């Protein structure tokens, strides 16, 4: 009721102001008729007396003496206007995109299609209606004469040629005629492309409309492919590889004859699949109880991520970690079974054990060829190169964890870190602690600037890809077919159940049919992803003229490295400025922003590298059989401590298998060092693409000349090894971690200096000395950072205190003491609240009375404010909150005072 009465009174107060008559100003006398001395109009010694009768003698007309003429003053020369300072010219963009030829991206057809309703698959409905109309029932009366397939096109390929037959095969290696081999390979290519095309189409349909029927169709297509691979591999083994003289023909034969785990007998392959399914099921469905919570237990692995990311009670995290590894210990027999069956499959492919078969993807060994280099030695060399950097990062984080978790039991200043303290269940990603441990407060403003540019320039997700495409064309890459733009999916279609993750660049196994599947959103992350996916598409497009068996990447590690290098290049400030996505102010990046960026990336990616080495070395020992069955868990932690400086949160439990907590061990049965190798290659390729002297952490601008070697390498596809591809791109055909260290150099220097100043112990082979109270750093509170909103005590509003680092909101910033409005805004004070507004309503008569409603309006750009009784802040400021400027008293402001009295009296 008070509010409604106040509102009515306020409206009543405003009406007289806005409806009053505007009176014309009195006309001024000419300059030569105006009296020079206003007091001369009155007689000396006879004061002017105000009366009601204007014709009284006292107020009678008084003669005014004629003024003496004065000489006309010489006209003053007109002042010359001050020349306006010329604006600072904007820097020239590094890339002239106006010179890039525009193309038809299918936007017209896309716009027309967007106005139509989504297509519906009415085939099933029509069949049911026809059946009902003809029979009066929806039950079919047809007699099934054979199996009904979800993918009849794929099924029709089975046994459609001799390449599906495995009867009457000759003995392995018995055919030594190379011409027969060439003829067989030509026929193989013609048959294989049909199968691969159907698998690609089935996958595309399912990923973009994940219905049960389309999933069944994809499964059938993949089963057909498995049958084809098995039969052709058996046929290929008839040829003697040692008799082949042509290196390319030999490489093709090697690709076809390799079966992998498909070489197992069907029953044994089924055992392998069942063991995998059991691992997946146990990992997902195992339940545990929270600390001090009695059964029934309901927490699953999916619930752990948020708990470990936000919980700061180390004892609770230890309880959850120990409970979960104990719960999944039942998977230990299944994992041992996978190791055994993997060894069997490796021997069928000509390898000593599963570890040797895994390494063959990198060392190029085969049944008839020895490894080209010792992969384990190369990995150890990489580790010795990056170990000093990792130890600096490890030491810095270890000290910070003492502050975050209040010096928890088991954490020392010179020993390994307990695995449950990294902010995730498996401890693989340290980035959960970024906000509380980052070196500096300043963050890059590029993401916000880019998002603003996207919105201002009416970007769509497709336009992000078009923008990236124009960048590639400026760097010498060729035109892509129009079908790429008309067939690809760049954004999620919400009327369908799409498989969005992961985004993928797809070779559809048909001439000029290349597509991308991405549920992209406007923003910096997906802008980077657009460049990553496009360079993968270009890899596929450039090797399209190779024979089918060479129409692949040289290695997945090469593709990953190239894709990640281009994602980084897309963040170069000069490139973004050329694309009109950031203003020129972003061309100069502060060192603090660069160090923060590198620190965050190191927590997300670099810290995983030692783990990949530990995980693979442990599994290689399992494949070799060198570790006793009752020592598997002990050995796991010994290796992790050696490479990572990480220890178990509890004493070793021989009945457990703690490694199964990691998806990269329990779910992915392939070398984890693929991550390490591709990450190292990323920086080798980045350094090769950029000019000499480039600061790798900032990237560079590419040109047609700098990408020439890369494009030539891509054209060769898998006809060359990944080491040869690396040599063609970088000039060096071996792994080298020095470019990685060069990239992280600003962060490495900062970590080294910070650890020295804080006297932090580097390494983890100490005696387990605990932190003293003085050594524990003061970290930000849990609500300070993270990816969510800051807590209430970490924000302040205009006029509020910000002395403790609070974030100023609502168009204000901290002047060291309080939050003041940004330049160009006005401060509107209503009661004890301040608001930053763009206009100046003071012209309407608002003032700052003494009542409960106080309205003061003043421009933050005032340079000569009136004196104020309030003391000025002593802290150094850039923009002061100006003192109140008292407005002239008006009937309206008096009415507001009366209004306030009435309001509080109600």
Swiss-Prot record:
Task: Identify the tissues in which this protein is expressed.
Answer: Expressed in the hypodermis, in the vulva during organogenesis, and in the ray papillae of the male tail.
- GO cellular-component term (any): membrane
Query: What is this protein's record name?
Result: Inactive angiotensin-converting enzyme-related protein
Keywords from the UniProt entry: Developmental protein, Disulfide bond, Glycoprotein, Signal
**Where is the secretion signal located?**
1-19
A Gene Ontology annotation in the biological process aspect, one of them, is:
plasma membrane fusion
Q: What PANTHER family is this protein classified in?
A: ANGIOTENSIN-CONVERTING ENZYME
Q: Where is the composition biased (Basic and acidic residues)?
A: 67-83
Domain Peptidase M2 as annotated: residue spans: 175-765
Q: Where on this protein are sugars attached?
A: 159, 653
Please state which protein family the record places this protein in: Belongs to the peptidase M2 family.
Known role: Inactive as a metallopeptidase, due to a lack of active site residues. Required for larval molting, male tail development, and formation of adult alae. Acts in the heterochronic pathway and plays a role in the developmental timing of postembryonic hypodermal seam cell division and adult alae production. Acts synergistically with apl-1 in let-7 regulated postembryonic cell division events. Might act downstream of the heterochronic protein lin-41.
What organism is the protein native to? Caenorhabditis elegans
Loss of function: phenotype? RNAi-mediated knockdown results in the extension of mean and maximum lifespan of 21% and 18%, respectively, and increased resistance to oxidative stress caused by paraquat. RNAi-mediated knockdown in a daf-16 mutant background shortens mean and maximum lifespan by 3% and 2%, respectively. RNAi-mediated knockdown in a let-7 mutant background partially suppresses the retarded and supernumerary hypodermal seam cell divisions, retarded alae production and postembryonic lethality.
Q: Which domain of life is it from?
A: Eukaryota
């Amino acid at each position: 009721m008070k509010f409604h009465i106040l509102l009515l009174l306020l409206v009543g107060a405003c009406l007289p102001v806005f409806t009053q008559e505007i009176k014309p100003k009195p006309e001024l006398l000419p300059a030569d008729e105006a009296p020079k001395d206003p007091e001369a109009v009155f007689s000396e010694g006879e004061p002017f007396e105000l009366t009601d009768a204007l014709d009284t003698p006292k107020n009678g007309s008084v003669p005014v003496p004629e003024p003496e003429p004065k000489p006309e003053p010489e006209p003053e020369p007109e002042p010359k206007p001050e020349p306006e300072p010329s604006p600072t010219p904007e820097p020239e963009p590094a890339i002239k995109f106006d010179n890039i030829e525009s193309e038809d991206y299918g936007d017209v057809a896309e716009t027309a299609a967007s106005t139509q309703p989504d297509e519906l698959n009415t085939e099933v409905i029509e069949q049911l209606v026809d059946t009902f109309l003809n029979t009066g029932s929806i039950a079919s009366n047809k007699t099934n004469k054979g199996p009904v397939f979800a993918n009849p096109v794929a099924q029709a390929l089975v046994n459609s040629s001799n390449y599906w037959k495995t009867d009457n095969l000759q003995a392995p290696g018995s055919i030594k005629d190379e011409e027969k081999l060439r003829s067989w390979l030509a026929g193989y290519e013609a048959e294989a492309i049909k199968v691969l095309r159907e698998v690609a189409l089935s996958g595309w349909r399912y990923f973009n409309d994940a219905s049960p029927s389309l999933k069944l169709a994809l499964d059938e297509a993949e089963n057909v492919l498995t049958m084809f691979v098995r039969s052709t591999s058996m046929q290929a083994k008839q040829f003697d590889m040692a008799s082949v003289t042509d290196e390319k023909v030999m490489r093709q034969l090697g690709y076809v004859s390799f079966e992998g785990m498909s070489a197992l007998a069907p029953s044994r392959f089924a055992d392998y699949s069942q063991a995998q399914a059991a691992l997946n099921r146990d990992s997902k469905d195992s339940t545990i109880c929270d600390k001090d919570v009695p059964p029934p237990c309901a927490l699953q692995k999916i619930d752990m991520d948020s708990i470990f990311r936000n919980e700061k009670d180390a004892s609770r995290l230890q309880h959850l970690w120990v409970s979960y590894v104990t719960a999944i210990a039942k998977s230990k027999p299944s994992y041992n079974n996978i190791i055994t069956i993997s060894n069997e499959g490796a021997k069928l492919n000509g390898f000593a054990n599963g570890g040797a078969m895994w390494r063959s993807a990198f060392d190029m060994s085969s049944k008839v060829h020895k490894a080209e280099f010792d992969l384990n030695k190369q990995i150890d060399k990489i580790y010795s190169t990056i170990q000093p950097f990792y130890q600096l990062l490890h030491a810095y984080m270890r000290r910070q964890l003492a502050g975050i978790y209040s010096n928890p039991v088991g954490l020392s200043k010179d020993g390994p870190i307990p695995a449950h303290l990294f902010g995730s269940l498996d401890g693989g990603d340290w980035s959960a602690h970024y906000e509380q441990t980052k070196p500096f407060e300043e963050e890059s403003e590029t993401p916000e600037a880019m998002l603003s540019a996207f919105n201002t320039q009416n970007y769509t997700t497709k336009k992000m890809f078009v923008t990236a495409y124009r960048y590639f064309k400026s760097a010498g890459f060729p035109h892509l077919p129009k079908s790429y733009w008309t067939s690809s999916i760049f954004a999620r279609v919400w009327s369908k159940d799409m498989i969005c993750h992961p985004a993928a660049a797809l070779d559809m196994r048909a001439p000029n049919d290349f597509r991308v599947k991405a549920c992209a959103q406007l923003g910096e992350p997906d802008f980077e992803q657009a460049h990553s996916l496009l360079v993968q598409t270009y890899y596929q497009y450039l090797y399209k003229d190779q024979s089918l068996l060479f129409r692949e990447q040289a290695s997945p590690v090469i593709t990953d490295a190239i894709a990640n290098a281009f994602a980084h290049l897309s963040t170069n400030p000069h490139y973004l400025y050329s694309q009109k996505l950031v203003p020129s102010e972003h061309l100069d990046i502060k060192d603090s922003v660069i160090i923060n960026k590198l620190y965050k990336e190191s927590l997300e990616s670099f810290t995983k590298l030692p783990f990949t080495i530990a995980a693979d070395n442990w599994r290689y020992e399992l494949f070799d059989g060198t570790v006793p069955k009752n020592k598997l868990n002990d050995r796991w932690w010994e290796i992790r401590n050696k490479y990572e400086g990480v220890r178990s949160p509890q004493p070793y439990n021989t009945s457990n298998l703690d490694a199964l907590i990691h998806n990269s061990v329990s779910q992915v049965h392939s070398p984890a060092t693929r991550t390490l190798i591709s990450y190292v290659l990323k920086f080798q390729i980045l350094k090769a693409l950029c000019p000499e002297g480039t600061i790798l952490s900032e990237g560079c601008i590419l040109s047609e000349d700098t990408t020439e070697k890369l494009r030539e390498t891509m054209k060769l596809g898998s006809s060359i090894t990944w080491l040869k591809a690396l040599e063609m791109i970088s000039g060096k055909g071996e792994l080298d971690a020095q470019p990685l260290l060069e990239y992280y150099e600003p962060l490495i220097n900062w970590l080294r200096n910070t650890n020295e100043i804080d006297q932090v112990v580097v390494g983890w082979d100490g005696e387990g000395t605990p932190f003293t109270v003085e050594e524990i750093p003061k970290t930000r509170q849990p609500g300070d950072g993270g990816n969510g909103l800051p807590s209430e005590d970490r924000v302040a509003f205009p006029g509020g205190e910000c002395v403790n680092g609070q974030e100023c909101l609502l168009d204000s910033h901290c002047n060291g003491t309080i939050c003041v409005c940004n330049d160009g805004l006005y401060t509107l004070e209503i009661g004890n609240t301040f608001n930053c507004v763009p206009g100046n309503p003071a012209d309407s008569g608002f003032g700052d009375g003494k009542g409960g409603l106080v309205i003061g309006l003043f421009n933050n750009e005032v340079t000569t404010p009136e004196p104020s009784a309030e003391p000025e802040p002593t802290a150094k400021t850039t923009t002061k909150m100006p003192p109140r400027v008292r407005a002239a008293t008006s009937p309206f402001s008096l009415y507001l005072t009366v209004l306030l009295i009435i309001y509080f009296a109600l």
